[in-house]
């Protein structure tokens, strides 16, 4: 019978370095006999403090004094010199602080789940009421969203290597032993599983364990996997009414300083799918917004509803209704324009601002922006978008064709006619009726965009382009101002519309600007180079938001 269930231990498999390793290092550091700490910890079974802890009969704070006393008795019995101030809680605190998720192992579990495997964590764990309990909480919070089941000994009252917990695993997952592969870093925990008929893998080295897991499951794990994206069905959705009849939809994850992710055209909150979990795990309350006109947000037909002044006012109301005094704003494409304007017109509400691809360009009060657009060939598509109903008809006719034509990697054949849309009568005129799928998307992701745009059509999204003169007049009110909030500009080497050189004079208006640059990347930055985007954003956020300089920028 083929394998269809993958069960993973936590400590030493999904989390490294292991607590057992911490015991070993502490034995060496304290000049204690080998196995003095680890041996007593393990041989307290049965019915000792550790078994009671792992079965949830006592909590961590109750366990510590019992183990401290046990170690003191053991030290006298064997003549070991235990420090006077010794406490097992210190060793655990250090071990938990040092422990982090074993990313290659997690990615393997995710790959197996994508392939159709049921995945499960089976761990001897404890009820942590200690003062360092947040580290365990954070780890379990992140891991649990990627597995179908979580079996913790302290919650079910059974521990490895007792056979009962393996039977509980099979009953819970409705699986037969020969359908299960089980990974653990202790051979004693694997033996009962193997005796029952499960395939077992002893994890002493992640790389070799993964090679064995590939072999037994017939799955090739990617060498450089993408960040873990969020699933629309597994995230929290919210709505804020910003004025009568108009609401904004958002997806929320994490806790900490508020961070608003704002997408461009023709996209969705879903375009931030690779960033949402990573930023939440980095310590932020992430709110990925469906911009006005998109998805589950309201999509009024009137052009003036999409004027930049109104969009920014509604974003302030969005914060007000959620009780958020300040937020970090990160925008891409059209939303890049919006977040720069938020920093310019509502600096007191902007904790920091970042833009992907879209530079800050102050208006020229003497030159009409439409004249500028007409003078730049690559902006020709924006002229095509001006007449209501025309582009809508083209883009809505076959939305699979539309999104597969738009979402292309920088090294793939480009289809949309940004340079000559008005001349040839459309942006998709030379596009295949059934374009091949880009390597930066999946069929399921394209289908999600299609379903979102079936709700609203393209009228609202295109209206963002139809307020050029109105936006220009409003933005001229900010002439002479500088952006002094923490700011980041991320350029993409191969974006043919928002070219990196367009940002070269930004320091004149944003004197404390930080920069990031991504090579071999086109316009769809968040999905083409998600790892690089996440690294740049998190590094900047940690410096400018979580640990900001106290130096005044005024």
Curated annotation (Swiss-Prot):
UniProt family annotation: Belongs to the AB hydrolase superfamily. Epoxide hydrolase family.
| PANTHER family recorded | EPOXIDE HYDROLASE
Q: What happens when the gene is disrupted?
A: In knockout mice, hepoxilin turnover to trioxilins is greatly abolished. In livers, the activity toward HxA3 (8-hydroxy-(11S,12S)-epoxy-(5Z,9E,14Z)-eicosatrienoate) and HxB3 (10-hydroxy-(11S,12S)-epoxy- (5Z,8Z,14Z)-eicosatrienoate) is greatly reduced compared with the WT mice.
Question: Which tissues show it?
Answer: Detected in liver, intestine, ovary and kidney. Detected at low levels in heart and muscle.
Chain's gene name: Ephx2
Return the protein name. Bifunctional epoxide hydrolase 2
Which residues carry the post-translational modification Phosphoserine, per the record? 368
Q: Which GO terms describe its molecular function?
A: 10-hydroxy-9-(phosphonooxy)octadecanoate phosphatase activity; epoxide hydrolase activity; lipid phosphatase activity; lysophosphatidic acid phosphatase activity; magnesium ion binding; protein homodimerization activity; toxic substance binding
What sequence ranges are listed for the domain AB hydrolase-1?
A: 257-530
Residues annotated to bind phosphate: 123-124
Functional summary from the UniProt entry: Bifunctional enzyme. The C-terminal domain has epoxide hydrolase activity and acts on epoxides (alkene oxides, oxiranes) and arene oxides. Plays a role in xenobiotic metabolism by degrading potentially toxic epoxides. Also determines steady-state levels of physiological mediators. Bifunctional enzyme. The N-terminal domain has lipid phosphatase activity, with the highest activity towards threo-9,10-phosphonooxy-hydroxy-octadecanoic acid, followed by erythro-9,10-phosphonooxy-hydroxy-octadecanoic acid, 12-phosphonooxy-octadec-9Z-enoic acid and 12-phosphonooxy-octadec-9E-enoic acid. Has phosphatase activity toward lyso-glycerophospholipids with also some lower activity toward lysolipids of sphingolipid and isoprenoid phosphates.
This enzyme catalyses: an epoxide + H2O = an ethanediol; (9S,10S)-10-hydroxy-9-(phosphooxy)octadecanoate + H2O = (9S,10S)-9,10-dihydroxyoctadecanoate + phosphate; 8-hydroxy-(11S,12S)-epoxy-(5Z,9E,14Z)-eicosatrienoate + H2O = (8,11R,12S)-trihydroxy-(5Z,9E,14Z)-eicosatrienoate; 10-hydroxy-(11S,12S)-epoxy- (5Z,8Z,14Z)-eicosatrienoate + H2O = (10,11S,12R)-trihydroxy-(5Z,8Z,14Z)-eicosatrienoate
Note the SUPFAM superfamilies from the entry: alpha/beta-Hydrolases, HAD-like
Q: What is its main location?
A: cytoplasm
**EC number per UniProt:** 3.3.2.10, 3.1.3.76
Lipoprotein keyword on record: yes
Sites of S-(15-deoxy-Delta12,14-prostaglandin J2-9-yl)cysteine lipidation: 521
Locate the region Epoxide hydrolase. 233-554
Stimuli inducing this protein:
Up-regulated during the luteal phase of the stimulated estrus cycle and by compounds that cause peroxisome proliferation, such as clofibrate, tiadenol and fenofibrate.
Write out the GO biological process terms: cholesterol homeostasis; dephosphorylation; epoxide metabolic process; phospholipid dephosphorylation; positive regulation of gene expression; regulation of cholesterol metabolic process; response to toxic substance; stilbene catabolic process
Residues that bear N6-succinyllysine: 55, 176, 371, 420, 454, 504, 508, 553
Write down the species: Mus musculus
Q: Name one GO cellular component term.
A: peroxisome
User: Where does it localize?
Assistant: Cytoplasm; Peroxisome
Locate the residues binding Mg(2+): 9, 11, 185
């Amino acid at each position: 019978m083929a394998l269809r269930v993958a069960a993973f231990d936590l400590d030493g498999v999904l989390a490294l370095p292991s607590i057992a390793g911490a015991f070993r290092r502490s034995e060496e550091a304290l000049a204690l006999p080998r196995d003095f700490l680890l041996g007593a910890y393990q041989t307290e079974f049965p019915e000792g403090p550790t078994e009671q802890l792992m079965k949830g009969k006592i909590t961590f704070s109750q366990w510590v004094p019992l183990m401290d006393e046990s170690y003191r008795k053991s030290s006298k019995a064997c003549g070991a010199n235990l420090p006077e101030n010794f406490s097992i809680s210190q060793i655990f605190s250090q071990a938990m602080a040092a422990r982090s998720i074993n990313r290659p192992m997690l990615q393997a579990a995710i790959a197996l789940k994508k392939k159709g495997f049921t995945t499960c964590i089976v761990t001897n764990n404890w009820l942590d009421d200690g003062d360092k309990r947040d580290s365990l909480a954070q780890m379990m919070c992140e891991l649990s969203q990627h597995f179908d089941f979580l079996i913790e000994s302290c919650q079910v009252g059974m521990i490895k290597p007792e056979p009962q917990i393996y039977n509980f695993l099979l009953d819970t997952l409705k699986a037969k032993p020969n359908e299960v592969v089980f990974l653990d870093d202790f051979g004693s925990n694997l033996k009962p599983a193997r005796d029952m008929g499960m395939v077992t893998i002893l994890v002493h080295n992640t790389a070799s364990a993964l090679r064995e897991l590939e072999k037994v499951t017939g799955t090739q794990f990617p060498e450089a996997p993408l960040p873990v994206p969020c699933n629309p069905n597994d995230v929290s959705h919210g709505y804020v009414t910003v004025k009568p009849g108009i609401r904004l939809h958002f997806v929320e994850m994490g806790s900490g300083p508020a961070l608003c992710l704002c997408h461009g055209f023709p996209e969705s909150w879903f375009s931030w799918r690779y960033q949402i979990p990573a930023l939440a795990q980095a310590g932020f309350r992430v709110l990925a917004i469906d911009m006005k006109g998109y998805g589950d947000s309201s999509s009024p037909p009137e052009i003036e509803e999409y004027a930049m002044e109104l969009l920014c006012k509604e974003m302030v109301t969005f914060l007000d209704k959620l009780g958020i005094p300040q937020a970090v704003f990160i925008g891409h494409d059209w939303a890049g324009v919006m977040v720069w304007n938020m920093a310019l017109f509502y600096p007191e509400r902007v904790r920091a601002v970042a833009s992907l691809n879209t530079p800050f360009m102050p208006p020229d009060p003497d030159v009409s922006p439409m004249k500028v657009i007409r003078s730049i060939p690559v902006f020709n598509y924006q002229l095509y978008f001006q007449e209501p109903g025309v582009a809508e008809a083209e883009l809505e006719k076959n939305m699979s064709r539309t999104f597969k034509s738009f979402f292309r990697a920088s090294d793939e054949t480009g289809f949309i006619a940004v340079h000559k849309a008005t001349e040839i009568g459309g942006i998709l005129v030379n596009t295949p009726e059934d374009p091949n799928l880009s390597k930066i998307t999946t069929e399921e992701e394209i289908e999600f965009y299609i379903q979102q745009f079936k709700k609203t059509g393209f009228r609202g999204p295109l209206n963002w382009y139809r307020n050029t003169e109105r936006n220009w007049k409003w933005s001229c009110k900010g002439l002479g101002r500088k952006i002094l909030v923490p700011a980041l500009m991320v350029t993409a080497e191969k974006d043919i519309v928002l070219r990196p050189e367009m940002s070269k004079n930004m320091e004149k208006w944003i004197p404390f600007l930080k920069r990031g640059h991504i090579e071999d990347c086109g316009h769809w930055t968040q999905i083409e180079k998600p790892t690089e985007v996440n690294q740049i954003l998190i590094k900047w956020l940690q410096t400018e938001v979580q640990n900001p300089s106290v130096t005044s920028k005024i």
